[in-house]
Amino acid sequence: KWSSNQLQLYLKSHKIIYNCEINSIKKTTFVCLNKSTMSTEKTIQSALISVFDKTGLEPIVRQLHQQNATIYSTGGTEDFIKNLGIPVIAVEDVTSYPSILGGRVKTLHPKVFGGILNRQDNATDVAQMKEYDIPQIDLVIVDLYPFEKTVASGANEADVIEKIDIGGISLIRAAAKNFKDTVIVPSVDEYELFLEMILAGNGATTIEQRKYLASKAFHVSSHYDAAIFNYFNNEDAIFKVSIANGQSLRYGENPHQKGFFFGDFDAMFTKLH
């Protein structure tokens, strides 16, 4: 854990928070748990949720329901929310199109992406939202199909191809692009952090928090696409690497420098004893 002073210095230097009052916090959690902030806050009034991994999703859904947010969903996620006894609107009811092509096309529709990408301070966008009856979507929660795990399992090519997420990756990129107005939670790894944000902010997020989550979103999308490229690439002398969760070292090449290790340290050596 970091001390309050250490945490505030780090977060202020990265423009994530201002005037934060915290006793201590986990080192991996970079979010202000105090509502005092210099930025404009946006309250979440609507959410689109479409996830593969639902671990830890329930408390988020319950919190959104408690703050009277409208929840849109599809497929298995929609069933999950219904089973919690929480009202949910099917995306198909918004688009007037069913899930088609064996589930390959569910959320790819202007009424979905218009709700995510509209600029709320742009008069033309506001007018078109009204003209085409597009619902506002303040929050997008996505967890992608497990492409890398499917490849690692030795699955055949047909099964691997079906685990290339199209709608999910599009939702992630759209919401991240419009972080000024839209919150993106791009993977199960960010569920806990996001829940802390809205609990601390009474259902609202700051522009710093939204931009921070957008950076996480583009990491998820770039890592995902790199894995897909490496699977398909059999000829070009190109290999794309994206490694997360670097381990902090005591110091870098010199004592005054910072050092990190990325990768699987155990895989580099053969254990003798």
Residue ranges of model-derived segments:
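Glycine-rich nucleotide/cofactor/substrate-binding loop typically near the N-terminus or early
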Residues: 76-146
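Internal gly/pro-rich beta-alpha loop/helix module
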Residues: 163-164, 182-246
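N-terminal glycine-/serine-/threonine-rich phosphate-binding loop
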Residues: 38-91
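A short, charged helix-loop
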Residues: 139-162, 166-205, 267-272
